């Protein structure tokens, strides 16, 4: 009925098969988790690029309108981005406001040539951008991200001003 010599060998082999299966399954799980996290982060970074493109189009559109023209802007951002900031290096930059958001942000803003930042700054490889015709009413103008960012753009003749709603 049972061949004892084969059964003994099979019993010795079975734990190794189970261990090997567990190791392979855990490696597949870890690799899948890593790939999915990277895809989600890449998607969020792409959404930042779309946000920048949409904002740049709005600024260019209202720059070409008459002085005093304004619009409410509502753009979407990924939840991992805490703040959307606009700043001008040409005017006084309020260090205390930036320190409330993130310590060290003032140093980052004073060293770059861009005027738009997504905080945390290092979340995406490209989190600093420049729109030449855009100036904030407050310096810096940082808006808390709730999934959507709301602010007003107004043509001031030589530039487009951004302010909180």
PLM features: residue spans?
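N-terminal leader/signal peptides at the extreme start of proteins
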Residues: 1-10
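Long, compositionally biased, intrinsically disordered regions
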Residues: 2-3, 16-165
